[in-house]
Regions:
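ATP-dependent adenylation/nucleotidyltransferase module used to activate substrates
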Residues: 2-152, 158, 188-196, 248
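Generic structural signal for well-ordered, non-membrane alpha-helical segments
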Residues: 14, 120, 212-215, 230, ...
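Catalytic subdomain that performs nucleotidyl-dependent activation
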Residues: 66-67, 146-218, 222-225
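Short, solvent-exposed coil/turn elements at secondary-structure transition points
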Residues: 73-75, 101-103, 171, 184, ...
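Long, contiguous binding/interaction regions
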Residues: 87, 153, 227-231
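An accessory alpha-helical subdomain
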Residues: 218, 222-244
Length: 251
């Protein structure tokens, strides 16, 4: 039986944020009755906000699903995920601490453009293994609308393709589905919620992020400049990207 949530750990979520997540889950059929959902908790503001949103949905939605949490520990210096475990267990949820020497294996990629993507692929593989081992069939990730927009422009500028991340898709093996319930949410919303609640945010400590400005950061700055001129920017981008985001929604 899944642990129940303690009343004292129920975190209020802003209605707008909750509505946007609920709409995304409905629009893309992200969670089905009886699903066992494993949330990838990095310790950032986005995954911590998503944890609060999904625990609230689990309590109040008519949709019945199980929820667990996994944190990938890349064995990088100063990464201490214990506060995340305390937070998750305080919510009455199972927490899986996945220790893998991703940091060590990635050192030979340091300084190359592929460094971040290499780490991301490694982390994703660890999460897939955890989900399969523990009997989960859905992996929930914390990318938001800003992330989708940045990926869209990076693909267009550097690969000559109109692509972005998918809101909901099956992995190649067919046994897991991956969902991104924050697809309609803005980064500033998750930041305001996580910081306002005093959630145990872990600051990024990857040396590659400090030494080399990423292309994603450049896209973030470009979009911020354009949004300052046109506040409707992300609404328009969402409309433009929706066919791309929905292309692999499972039947």
């Amino acid at each position: 039986m899944e642990p129940t949530l303690g009343e004292e750990h129920r975190l209020p979520v802003p209605r707008l944020l909750a509505r946007r997540v609920g709409k995304a889950i409905q629009d893309y059929r992200m969670i089905w009755p009886g699903d066992r959902v494993l949330l990838a908790l990095s310790g950032g503001k986005d995954s911590l906000s998503l944890l609060a949103l999904l625990t609230q949905m689990q309590r109040h939605s008519k949709l019945s699903f199980s929820l667990g949490v996994a944190t990938v520990d890349p064995q990088s210096p100063d990464f201490q995920p214990e506060p995340l475990g305390e937070h998750v267990r305080g919510l009455g949820l199972p927490w899986f601490w996945e220790r893998q020497d991703i940091f060590g294996r990635a050192q030979k990629h340091l300084g190359r453009p592929s460094y971040c993507s290499f780490c991301a692929r490694m982390r994703r593989g660890v999460l897939y293994q955890c989900a399969r081992r523990e009997g989960y069939n859905v992996l929930a990730l914390g990318q938001h609308l800003d992330d989708f927009a940045e990926s869209f422009f990076m693909s267009m500028f550097y690969n000559g393709e109109l692509r972005t991340m998918k809101a909901h898709y099956r992995v190649r093996e067919g046994d897991l589905r991956v969902i991104r319930p924050l697809v309609y949410c803005r980064e500033r919303q998750t930041r305001a919620y996580a910081e306002g609640q005093g959630l145990p945010i872990i600051i990024e400590n990857c040396p590659a992020c400090f030494r080399h400005p990423t292309e994603r950061q450049r896209m973030k700055e470009l979009l911020a400049q354009q949004e300052a001129r046109d506040p409707r920017l992300f609404k328009q981008l969402l409309h433009a990207m929706q066919p791309l985001m929905a292309r692999e929604v499972p039947a």
